[in-house]
């Protein structure tokens, strides 16, 4: 049988690969693959749930501290105040944990551009996650869209990738500065298909 010919890996490529493995140890990178850019979601996507949860915590806190004043006019027992404090504190803690989980899940949705592929991590819930990997060679088209005043004002939008062959479409929403991200991606795809090194400077 014929042994596969080992591919020569330059010192620079090896260094970049090792650095990427150190920064993103959960990614399954080949021995000559490294991360060029990590694209997180724009924080605006979590502003609404965060505001709602903070408002709920404030309302529960106000009720807890004002219970004696509220209870007297409507005939509720003042002796219940210790139990009310305990229940309100438990509700506040639950709201806080829920907010933390929501932010964590949202921010775990990430988009990686390497010198060989695009990797999209999709965190659906606390215990549900999937990953999509597309070779740069298979990317036929990449584009971005910004719709509405908010997306234009805060400079975020969506990235869309379409692939050759199976014609699958990949989308990543709430991307900060999508125009620049797509420019970097298009340069990387062009360099890869033309056999040129894919670097951060492309």
Regions found by a protein language model. Give the residues of each.
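N-terminal basic, Ser/Thr-rich segments that initiate or prime the first beta/alpha elements at protein or domain
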Residues: 1-202
